[in-house]
């Protein structure tokens, strides 16, 4: 883009097109103006040269007051999403009011207003943290703006689209304007690996990838790991878990498994012929260390909470298989969070009936990090997700494999 086609605004380092200048002048409404003001401020902070188009977005806003402010600011200003923009979960208000009758009215009101704001903005009301599985699926090489810490690395690494680690507000702003600043992971040289991770640990299942993600995130913090030594191609759920848990202990917006993920077939390609900043080895000992670190209790439990990130159809099938012919112990509540899409299919396949018949609950549209779970504040819980344990701040946390969670729910305790 040449300077002659752009307008440089006073006090800004970015070049903006004439249409972008008109948006900032308020010609397209106050809501769109506020959205672009935020994006320009971000671009200015990161020395972005210009804005680039995005084809879709995912906003991780939730039913909390900080998110409500920005959603209503745009919606009340008449903004509409210009590109498909999906939404993170809030919570199923009628369902939780029925279960926990004393949810504070002000909390429910905030959630209702957030959801209404998205409706007015014309967003996709998916209420799911795994939109890339059904409701909002990017293609390889597509430029997008995704928030949700587990979605960003999945979109960059597994799908091979391009997104920065967006905030809920910046992703929503990009969805409204249809653009994002050109910086960070939208630039090829910034997508090169930073750390070489040599994996010799045995990776048998989803939970091993949970531990791997947790350990790698903690060791690296912020960076782009390149993992070698993984011979078998991870399945979707294993990759989701790796993405999610590497962002509990760290901030991993992208990773490579050369030959397995889509963007680099060799280690050299992943590092763009540069050398790694550091090398990390992951053996069974490191995974055991990560597992031990996540345990703070044993014995009697009050509840089991699964689905952070939202469970897939395959995972719901696994839960149903483990619960078939069994009953949840009296006094223990058993919850599985999932997307509306996955629940519909699970109902058709009979999985929801089995889970509910055993005394469990399958809830949609709901995030672990929401006020609706207040009743569990001082109780002892178990989950298969370190992210869930982190968000809920269990009085005492037990983290284990799915089969261990189901066994504890049936027995009423973890042994």
Q: What are the residue ranges of the model-derived segments?
A:
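Intrinsic disorder/low-complexity segments
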Residues: 1-10
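Non-transmembrane, aqueous-exposed alpha-helical and coiled segments at domain scale
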Residues: 9-415
């Amino acid at each position: 883009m040449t300077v002659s086609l752009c307008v440089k605004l006073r006090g800004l380092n970015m070049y903006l097109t004439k249409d972008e200048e008109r948006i900032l002048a308020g010609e397209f409404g106050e809501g769109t103006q506020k959205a672009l003001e935020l994006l320009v401020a971000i671009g200015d902070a990161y020395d972005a040269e210009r804005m680039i188009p995005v084809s879709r977005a995912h906003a991780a806003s939730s039913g909390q007051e900080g998110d409500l402010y920005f959603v209503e600011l745009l919606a009340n200003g008449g903004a509409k999403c210009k590109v498909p923009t999906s939404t993170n979960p809030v919570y199923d208000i009628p369902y939780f009011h029925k279960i926990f009758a004393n949810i504070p009215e002000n909390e429910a009101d905030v959630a209702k207003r957030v959801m209404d704001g998205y409706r007015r903005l014309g967003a996709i009301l998916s209420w799911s943290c795994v939109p890339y599985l059904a409701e909002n699926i990017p293609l390889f090489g597509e430029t997008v703006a995704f928030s949700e810490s587990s979605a960003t690395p999945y979109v960059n690494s597994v799908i091979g689209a391009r997104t920065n680690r967006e905030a809920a507000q910046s992703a929503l702003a990009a969805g409204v304007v249809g653009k994002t600043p050109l910086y960070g992971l939208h630039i090829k040289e910034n997508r090169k690996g930073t750390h070489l991770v040599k994996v010799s640990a045995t990776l048998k299942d989803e939970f091993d990838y949970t531990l791997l993600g947790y350990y790698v995130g903690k060791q690296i913090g912020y960076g782009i790991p390149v993992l070698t030594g993984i011979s078998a191609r991870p399945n979707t759920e294993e990759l989701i878990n790796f993405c999610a848990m590497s962002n509990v202990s760290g901030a991993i917006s992208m990773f490579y498994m050369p030959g397995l993920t889509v963007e680099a077939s060799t280690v050299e390609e992943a590092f763009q012929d540069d050398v790694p900043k550091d090398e990390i080895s992951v053996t069974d000992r490191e995974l055991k260390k990560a597992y031990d670190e996540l345990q703070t209790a044993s014995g009697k439990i009050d509840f089991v909470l699964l689905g952070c990130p939202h469970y897939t159809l395959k995972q719901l099938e696994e839960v149903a298989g483990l619960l078939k012919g069994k009953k949840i112990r009296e006094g223990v509540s058993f919850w599985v969070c999932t997307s509306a899409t996955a629940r519909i299919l699970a109902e058709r396949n009979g999985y929801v009936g089995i889970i509910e018949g055993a005394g469990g609950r399958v809830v949609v549209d709901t995030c672990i990090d929401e006020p609706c779970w207040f009743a569990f504040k001082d109780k002892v819980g178990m989950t298969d997700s370190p992210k869930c344990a982190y968000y809920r701040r269990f009085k005492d946390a037990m983290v284990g494999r799915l089969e261990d969670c189901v066994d504890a729910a049936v027995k009423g305790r973890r042994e």
